[in-house]
Amino acid sequence: MTLSNNIKNKKDNWNYIWKKKSNQIKAKNIKDLLFLNGWDANLSKFSVKSWKNFVNYFISKNKINKSHTILEIGCGAGAFLLPFYKKNIKCYGIDNITNFIKICKNFMPKAKFYTAEANNLKIVKKIKFDFIFCHSIFQYFPSKKYANQVLKEVLKFKTKKNKIFILDIPDYKKKKNYISQLKRQIGKRKYKEKYSKNMHQFYNYEYFVKIVKKNNYKIEKLTKNLLNKKTSRYRFNVIIY
């Protein structure tokens, strides 16, 4: 999970939380990777089968095969990349949590993983990617300024043929409903303890449209609930092509 180094030493931020999470268990299977990636909360729980179906949707829909090279920005413990890797697809992953990168390398020794920030992708700048994924990371960015930097950096890799997927983006238009649901689910006290200093970033679809079209690329909104989890109704996905 990729966040800004500017805040990584403060305990009350997502970066600290993910560092702590990365050391909670010794991962032995994809279920453990999902736990380390934070998919254990009541609102975001789902089965391993649902997860595999979710990832395989992108593989089959886009006819991704072993001739392709993919990059995941904010790869966490590697749960999203693992199904690609098992199909002999060339995988690259970036995250700024060192322990997550170690876990990824352990599960996918032939893939390439790097410790880096999402807004500075120089380490892979010479590589041409057929597909780039940012799954469920934009909510953890410290500011819209940082998100702008990430989008600018990611779009440097855009070509006429490749695609960029930004997935599981919190919808600003549904923010109030999401917070209400969260409070009902975990209680107002726990909500305040957990989110008073670490609230997610929310985005309008128009935010992405403006930046993408400014760079003369096309963008598509995908609202279909591809993953069977409760938070999906408050999220959207974008495809840049």
Where are these regions (language model features)?
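Class I (Rossmann-like) S-adenosyl-L-methionine-dependent methyltransferase catalytic domain
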Residues: T2-N62, I73-I89, D95-K110, T115-L121, ...
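Short helix-loop-beta connector
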Residues: K63-H68
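Class I S-adenosylmethionine-dependent transferase superfamily signal
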Residues: F84, E153-V154
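Short amphipathic alpha-helix with an adjacent loop that forms part of the alpha/beta core around
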Residues: L121-I127
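A conserved beta-strand element that flanks and buttresses the S-adenosyl-L-methionine
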Residues: F133
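Short catalytic micro-motifs in class I SAM-dependent methyltransferases
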Residues: S136-Y140
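A short, conserved alpha-helix within the catalytic core of class I
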Residues: F141-E153
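Helix-to-beta-strand junctions that scaffold the AdoMet/dcAdoMet cofactor pocket
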Residues: F141-P142, K158-K160
